[in-house]
């Protein structure tokens, strides 16, 4: 290969023309030959330099060497499309390598299949995240790369934009910056047979130590979902930037985004001392830790606020508040952060009942500790001293937190260490704009080991459309994060139906009217204890099932359904609705208050509509059969 590169370099003389090579390698992960295109600086053969690498992920119907089918003037590799603002032109004037992998995922040998990456649907056994790490190792072994995370980035368009953010969030220990040109916001991913919905707006905690950039277009068909994502990431994700161009779906001003990566290479973020991670796979590495499980069902494993002092763990069906999966077994190995062959005091708190288990565990020869847990919620503390963590919170005096109004929270603080904490002062902070904190300081009493206390937070969000607010409880220089979902002021719904095993004509896939039965119960149109219901809001001559929110103790909201709108807007995303259960112990006459949200189609600018719902829990009437609508 060196001879070929040298001849190509000599053939272009001293012009800074890049070398664009189409190559193959044998993948052990896939058990097949895979293609890639590599863009090398024009003087690569003679410079002796090492280069940072941007891994590029193409979109639907593209290949490593082919632009999108049936859409002319979309070649961003090289040439004069996009006014010549292409990968090749950028590499020709910068010290960087770009590797464009091949997302080809044929279901049968040699099939001309346009859908890449084996996502939505997961229909083969090719797992591209596992192949990505193999490709990185191959490129580092065969080209003069600067082979560390600080000099490695991802970028991509459309489905490739989704992949860029997914790979950077799955492997932040390998990648220091990620960009996304108008990427799809949501796909099902993971092992075939138990793939799970992966929605970027809910995955913002995966990017500790990573700079991120989202490129949007004023005429892009995905722009509604991008704005939804920005509304979350802007207030929860540091080192996130976004840029909107007057453009339709594509790669406008590519050099602006590649310049973002060059700046990130020059000033990479350090490895985070505290990090969080969410993963769709049962087994995965992250920041030197290793997680394994016996999970054979859709779910997401969550490690939160991980440091040498401990972590929070759980496995859920969906984020942020899907059903926990305590039947799943987890085996977690820490990074080698502890003195080899020395014992550490480990405190484990099972949050559902506060049960505390404390053991002395010996680190192995590599300084790693090992933990066996299940998929329930746990706080794990490591060390002999006090270790504080924030637990659950409750909105006081209201069923949800409202924009523009004072919000009072009761927040639980745990001591997951092995010694009592001393009485001190807790300080509340936020980096969010237009947020006033009414209780910037609160006294925090002594907390016994394994115990908890409650504190309060009073705040007001002055933005009428904020969807989330993030705060930090600062105690003795330790910053403990908490994120609060926010909701706009909304009028009471003038009309709605309670579907408790009864049929109605509802919209599915955005605009299709379909007769469906929702919920399970006696079908009398009232909410009874023990029933599963849906709230249906009228839209013309049919109904839309609502996504619901409340902190009411009588309501179990852990079941959420996704209505795929791909056939309507071609994005791959979905509208959500809830199937809450009225808990069996809920008394007759108890009044339930809920915030209802429906997604109204108007491609590409859909609209979210909010309304409040109120109904009493009724005495059960005579029952008849009803079945629940599922995805």
What spans do the regions from the language model cover?
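Acidic, glycine-anchored loop motifs typical of Ca2+
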Residues: 399-402, 505, 516-532, 563-575
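Short, solvent-exposed loop/turn segments enriched in Ser/Thr/Gly
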Residues: 404-410, 453-455, 468, 529-536, ...
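Short acidic, flexible loop segments centered on an aromatic residue
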Residues: 414-435, 439, 538-556, 595-598
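Intrinsically disordered, low-complexity Pro/Gly/Ser/Thr-rich segments with frequent PxxP/GP/PP motifs
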Residues: 436-464, 553-586
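C-terminal beta-strand-rich structural cap/linker in extracellular carbohydrate-active enzymes
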Residues: 364-389
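Terminal connector regions
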Residues: 388-393, 404, 460-495, 580-621
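Non-catalytic cap/lid and distal C-terminal segments of serine-dependent acyl enzymes
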Residues: 16-326
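Surface-exposed beta-strand/loop patches in extracellular or lumenal glycoproteins
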Residues: 321-340, 426
């Amino acid at each position: 290969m060196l001879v070929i590169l040298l001849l190509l370099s000599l053939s272009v003389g001293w012009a800074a023309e890049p070398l664009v090579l189409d190559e193959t390698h044998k993948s052990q992960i896939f058990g097949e030959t895979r293609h890639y295109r590599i863009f090398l600086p024009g003087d690569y053969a003679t410079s002796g330099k090492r280069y940072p690498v941007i891994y590029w992920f193409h979109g639907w119907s593209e290949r490593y060497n082919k632009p999108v089918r049936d859409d002319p003037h979309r070649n961003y590799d090289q040439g004069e499309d996009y006014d010549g603002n292409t990968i090749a032109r950028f590499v020709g004037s910068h010290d960087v390598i770009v590797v464009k992998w091949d997302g080809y995922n044929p279901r049968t040998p040699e099939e001309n299949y346009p859908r890449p990456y084996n996502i939505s649907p997961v229909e083969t056994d090719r797992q591209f995240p596992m192949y990505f790490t193999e490709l990185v190792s191959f490129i580092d072994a065969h080209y003069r790369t600067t082979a560390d995370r600080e000099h490695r980035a991802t970028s991509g368009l459309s489905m490739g934009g989704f992949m860029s953010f997914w790979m950077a969030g799955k492997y932040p220990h390998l990648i220091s910056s990620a960009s996304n040109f108008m990427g799809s916001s949501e796909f099902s991913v993971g092992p075939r047979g138990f793939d799970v919905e992966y929605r970027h707006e809910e995955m913002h905690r995966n990017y500790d130590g990573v700079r991120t950039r989202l490129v949007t277009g004023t005429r892009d068909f995905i722009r509604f979902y991008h704005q939804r994502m920005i509304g979350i990431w802007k207030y929860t994700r540091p080192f996130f930037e976004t840029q909107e161009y007057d453009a339709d779906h594509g790669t406008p001003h590519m050099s602006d985004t590649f310049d973002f990566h060059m700046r990130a290479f020059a000033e990479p973020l350090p490895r985070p001392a505290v990090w969080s991670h969410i993963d769709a796979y049962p087994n995965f590495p992250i920041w030197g830790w290793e997680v394994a499980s016996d999970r054979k069902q859709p779910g997401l494993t969550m490690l939160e606020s991980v440091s040498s002092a401990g972590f929070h763990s759980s496995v859920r069906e969906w984020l942020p508040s899907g059903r926990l999966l305590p039947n799943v077994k987890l085996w977690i190995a820490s990074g080698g952060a502890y003195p080899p062959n020395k014992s550490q005091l480990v405190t484990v708190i099972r949050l559902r009942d506060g049960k505390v288990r404390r053991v002395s565990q010996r680190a192995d020869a590599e300084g790693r500790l090992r933990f066996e847990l299940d998929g329930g919620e746990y706080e794990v503390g490591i060390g002999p001293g006090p270790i504080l963590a924030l637990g659950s919170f409750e909105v006081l005096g209201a069923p949800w937190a409202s924009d523009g109004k004072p919000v009072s929270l009761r927040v639980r603080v745990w001591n997951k260490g092995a010694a009592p904490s001393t009485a001190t002062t807790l300080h509340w902070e936020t980096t969010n704009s237009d947020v006033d904190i009414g209780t910037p300081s609160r006294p925090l009493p002594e907390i016994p080991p394994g115990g908890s206390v409650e504190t309060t937070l009073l705040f007001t969000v002055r933005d009428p459309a904020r969807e989330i607010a993030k705060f930090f409880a600062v105690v003795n220089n330790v910053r403990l994060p908490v994120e609060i979902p926010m909701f706009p002021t909304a009028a009471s719904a003038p009309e709605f139906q309670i579907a408790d095993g009864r049929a109605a004509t509802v919209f599915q896939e955005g605009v299709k009217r379909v007769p469906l039965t929702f919920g399970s119960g006696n079908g009398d149109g009232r909410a009874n204890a023990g029933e599963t219901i849906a709230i249906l809001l009228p839209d013309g001559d049919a109904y839309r099932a609502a996504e619901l929110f409340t902190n009411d103790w009588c309501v179990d909201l852990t079941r959420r359904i996704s209505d795929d709108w791909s056939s309507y807007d071609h994005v791959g995303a979905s509208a959500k609705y809830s199937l809450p259960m009225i808990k069996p112990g809920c008394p007759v006459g108890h009044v339930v208050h809920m915030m209802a949200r429906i997604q109204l189609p108007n491609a590409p600018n859909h609209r979210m509509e909010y309304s409040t719902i109120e109904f009493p829990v009724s005495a059960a009437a005579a029952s008849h059969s009803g079945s629940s609508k599922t995805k």
